[in-house]
Amino acid sequence: MSDSADGGRQAGPAVDEGGDAGRSGIDGSETGETGADDDGGGPAQVSSPNYHNENHTAAQTCGWTANALRGEGKCYKNIWYGIESHRCIQMTPVVRCNERCVFCWRDHNGHAYELDGVEWDDPEAVVDASIRLQKKLLSGFGGNEEVPREVFEQAMEPRHVAISLDGEPSLYPYLPELIEAFHDRDITTFLVSNGTRPEVLRECDPTQLYVSVDAPDRHTFDEVVGAMEDDAWEKLLETMAVLREKSETRTVLRTTLVKGENMHHPDWYAGFYEQADPDFVEIKAYMHVGHSRGRLDRSAMPHHDEVVEFAEDVMEYMPEFTECLEVPASHVALLSKTLDTWVPKLKKGSDFWARDPVVGD
């Protein structure tokens, strides 16, 4: 039985939203072998008990989900955006990626990009699979004395999904429809993309859209991101224009800082960010976990104070951004135009929570 299924402490990296190490991982985990339980003939690179799949849909228990169930703290996305960590699914509709980021914890050798022959499930099937996988992953917490019964019952009714676990979600051909299918279930969506499919992102309206910007210039991009498509940089630039057009979707640019690789020219980053006119900018530290340890030395992992200093340097060139918030436990800083950063519908007393099947009116 897996550590998640029996309600124990999660082994391996607790990864959330596209590679962030959750608390269980970044505060001491030295293992990084992550894959999926092959429940339905899924990709070969996913084979650990904490990472389950049905066909091309995969889910993993985020370390912060486990922590929240045990009352041991919540993710920075709760602090800044209002996400209830114990009610958040971490999943992906496609375990394939068209980039080979040097800081990625995943195994590039087993991370296929070719999409030929994939039998794509329809969006409703992906939503159903995601919920089933989440319930399976968390089922054992119901017998854990550290987990209050009411908290466990809430976790069995997920209200958020982070479409970010692995691969590049925009390679799934029905991503806009998938987002709407989650919304139809009253589940908020937090989509993380590398920005290489602007034509897809233009059609997507998640609750919050994150795009990774891990280099301020083409040379650094080629060195750090390792894109498998020659026009990836140009596509990322096009995605910035797509984000600028978004009016109903909250937009976030996110940068993973790697010492000696991309921690330079904060003014260039600011100029790049401003092309998108994002609502927020997340700047976080590379975490020395998983397969990235074979590509980078531990010294490439910046300290939290270095992350905050770099974020403040960037903010000097972005006068509209007046707030630099931080969560030391996650080694992340947030640039914002306001202190009111929560998703409006996730604020306490909203209609969203009034409709909740567990805690609603």
Q: For the regions a protein language model found, what residue spans apply to each?
A:
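Flexible, acidic/Gly-rich N-terminal and inter-domain linker regions that tether
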Residues: M1-V95, E99-F103, D107-K136
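Conserved AdoMet/S-adenosylmethionine-binding subsite of the radical SAM
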Residues: N144-R298, P302-D313
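Short Fe-S-cluster ligation motifs
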Residues: A125-A155
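Radical SAM enzyme [4Fe-4S]-AdoMet core and its adjacent flexible, acidic
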Residues: D3-D6, G12-G35, A44-Q45, E54, ...
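Short, acidic Gly/Pro/Ser/Thr-rich loop/turn segments
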Residues: R96-R100, R218, H288, W342
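Short Gly/Ser/Thr- and Asp/Glu-enriched loop/turn motifs at secondary-structure junctions
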Residues: H86, M156-P158, V327-H331
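Pocket-edge structural micro-motifs
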Residues: G63, P93, L165, S336-K337
